[in-house]
């Protein structure tokens, strides 16, 4: 499996109401995107799920979490309460293609699907 060691992100977070919680939301979104990129896969065999439990269905844990460098750009949203914006969703959406692009750049392999499995990148 691919080991992601560092992810850097910059995000417009509106007005930060709680910096620690905001960073936690960014890190959580990154973990979800990481899972989608290299871990989470439903395996079916003749229509039957072969990995129906968390024992078999891989999810990222704290041990899989990369170092996160996060820059929070504060541009308050005038129409939102206290100027806040959603924080956890954007990294989840952007991290998956960023990891796929990094693997493609490192290997030169066409990677038409996620999650990217070891057999997809073995040379």
Task: Set out the residue ranges of the language-model regions.
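C-terminal catalytic domains of large/alpha subunits in multi-subunit enzymes
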Residues: 1-123
